[in-house]
Amino acid sequence: MAATLLDVCAVVPAAGFGRRMQTECPKQYLSIGNKTILEHSVHALLAHPRVTRVVIAISPGDHRFAQLPLANHPQITVVDGGNERADSVLAGLQAVAKAQWVLVHDAARPCLHQDDLARLLTISENSRVGGILASPVRDTMKRGEPGKNAIAHTVERADLWHALTPQFFPRELLHDCLTRALNEGATITDEASALEYCGFHPALVEGRADNIKVTRPEDLALAEFYLTRTIHQEKA
């Protein structure tokens, strides 16, 4: 029988540096308003009553996290992350070994809306596999010729989606799929790809396209705009 309305834990891999931001500070510690990007991302998870614990995987040499109010939050657990995202997620899963369902959310994705999170969490009512937030591709997509800055052909976009986070899976299933994929040398770009590698087909839950990941310098201003707009809407 599928689980229903269970408390869930979340894992936030935050051990990366994000060199495309062209800053000396890891992007998750850049500020938007009076909070870091990491704080915005984590608080969006904790705002939902079903999310009872968040495990944050940080770099072993990270000295910034201890300076944040999150470091003393009663619902936050910190673990050492690994060299790759999948290693950090596995470390987080080890810390919530008794959890049945787990969210995984990008540390640098601060604009998560509560209605999107709520719809994603309903998956646990009737699924044994889980699913992800995703946004349908709207732009025309081109595949490039290998090694050249030239178009090979246009890619049909009808069934293409941008993968977002959070991604939501049974904890044991995600752990087993990540472990197998890593052991077999598979390329894992997100948690869903580990399940795909093992033959599962997670659900696509349409989410808002403004749930962006801060990756490049120009994303910071865009995320600030989205967050400010959301705050104003909530106060209205």
From Swiss-Prot:
The protein's matches in InterPro entries, at most eight in alphabetical order, are given as:
IspD (IPR001228), IspD/TarI (IPR034683), IspD/TarI_cytidylyltransf_bact (IPR050088), ISPD_synthase_CS (IPR018294), Nucleotide-diphossugar_trans (IPR029044)
Q: Where is this site: Positions MEP for the nucleophilic attack?
A: R157, K213
List UniProt keywords, sorted A-Z.
Isoprene biosynthesis, Nucleotidyltransferase, Transferase
**Enzyme Commission numbers on file:** 2.7.7.60
- Transport listed as a keyword: no
Question: Which Gene Ontology BP annotations are present?
Answer: isopentenyl diphosphate biosynthetic process, methylerythritol 4-phosphate pathway
* Pathways per UniProt: Isoprenoid biosynthesis; isopentenyl diphosphate biosynthesis via DXP pathway; isopentenyl diphosphate from 1-deoxy-D-xylulose 5-phosphate: step 2/6
Q: Where is this site: Transition state stabilizer?
A: R20, K27
Q: Name one Pfam family in it.
A: IspD
The chemistry this enzyme catalyses reads: 2-C-methyl-D-erythritol 4-phosphate + CTP + H(+) = 4-CDP-2-C-methyl-D-erythritol + diphosphate
Task: Indicate yes or no for the key word Kinase.
Answer: no
Q: GO terms for molecular function, please?
A: 2-C-methyl-D-erythritol 4-phosphate cytidylyltransferase activity
Say which family it is in: Belongs to the IspD/TarI cytidylyltransferase family. IspD subfamily.
Function (record text): Catalyzes the formation of 4-diphosphocytidyl-2-C-methyl-D-erythritol from CTP and 2-C-methyl-D-erythritol 4-phosphate (MEP).
Q: Return the PANTHER family for the record.
A: 2-C-METHYL-D-ERYTHRITOL 4-PHOSPHATE CYTIDYLYLTRANSFERASE, CHLOROPLASTIC (PTHR32125:SF4)
Q: How does it assemble?
A: Homodimer.
> What protein name is recorded for this chain?
2-C-methyl-D-erythritol 4-phosphate cytidylyltransferase
Which organism is this entry from? Salmonella heidelberg (strain SL476)
Phylogenetic placement of the source organism:
Bacteria, Pseudomonadati, Pseudomonadota, Gammaproteobacteria, Enterobacterales
Task: Name the gene that codes for it.
Answer: ispD
